[in-house]
Amino acid sequence: MGISRDNWHKRRKTGGKRKPVHKKRKYELGRPPSNTKLGPKRIHTVRVRGGNKKYRALRLDVGNFSWGSECCTRKTRIIDVVYNASNNELVRTKTLVKNCVILVDSAPFRQWYESHYALPLGRKKGAKLTPEEEDILNKKRSKKVQKKFDKRRKNSKISPLLDEQFQQGKLLACISSRPGQCGRADGYVLEGKELEFYLRKIKAKKGK
């Protein structure tokens, strides 16, 4: 039997059975879930009603993630799935769905921050820098350019929780697109109260 999104196969509110008045219709069809996994990109196209296309992501490993407080969006690697409010099974199988909490690579965001503010981010005291990083952070600048960076630095404060994550090289993020519908895993970096909430949830899950 095909997957059907009708309600005439259900019993009535009073408990009585319904006689099927017609066969299943094309407009009532449903399709199996894509269960998008972590891995090299694999996307299938599905022809849907009206001749339109849906992009069914079967495997994904990168996505566009937005760092809201800094208005910065970067393409970055998805490392792992760590939490899902609806089902722990989806965490175990590393399934990417909307609103699941994942770990993403922090390198693109750190590069942007260091070039934008000329300040180190998530680096240990006295850590060795590569020549390129040294050039970005400790370059001699003209007075005009230095003034511009000083003005920017007034807003360069980062929460201790985020700084801790940058030191580990991984950021907690949330997927806000629907990988099984649009074929992409895009989302945003968790910050503030939302980050605290999910850290508590993840810690509680580990403690079990």
Curated annotation (Swiss-Prot):
Presence of keyword Ribosomal protein: yes
Major subcellular site: cytoplasm
Gene3D superfamilies: 3.10.290.70, Ribosomal protein S8e, subdomain (1.10.168.20)
Keyword Ribonucleoprotein: yes
GO molecular function: structural constituent of ribosome
Positions of the UniProt region annotated as Disordered: 1-40
GO CC annotation terms, alphabetical: cytoplasm; ribonucleoprotein complex; ribosome
Keyword vocabulary terms for this entry: Cytoplasm, Ribonucleoprotein, Ribosomal protein
Compositionally biased spans, kind Basic residues: 8-26
GO biological process terms, semicolon-separated: translation
UniProt superkingdom: Eukaryota
Compartments, record wording: Cytoplasm
Database matches in Pfam families: Ribosomal_S8e (PF01201)
Family named by the database record: Belongs to the eukaryotic ribosomal protein eS8 family.
Job description of the protein: Component of the small ribosomal subunit. The ribosome is a large ribonucleoprotein complex responsible for the synthesis of proteins in the cell.
Subunit structure: Component of the small ribosomal subunit.
Name listed for the protein in its UniProt record: Small ribosomal subunit protein eS8
Gene: rps8
